[in-house]
Amino acid sequence: AVNAGINATTALARIENGGVLDDPASEVAAAAARETARAAREAGVDLSDAAAVAAVQEVAEATADNTSSMYQDVLAERRTEVDAINGAVAERIDAPVNRTLAGLLRAWERARDLR
């Protein structure tokens, strides 16, 4: 849930991890985390929406000045791990936020011949 909330959001918004603590990025990160928690529950993992969102906030606070690995990939114009994170959530359940984040990053990758 943490990676789904932080990585794609920071990569697309071009912000450090702490940027997901403020709106509107916090809304996107929290929604992606909630969808991921739902996918986890459907797979038998006990993860509440509240716990997933709290984990995103805790990691974002602890790593506020850090650049996520996905944002680092974007900066270096490398293919990202979006398929394994947000894409995986969107494949398992109806997850419009994760699907949108994955779609936007995949479009960015295609435009650079990375996929």
Predicted regions, residues:
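Active-site-proximal catalytic alpha-helix in oxidoreductases
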Residues: 1-38, 64-65
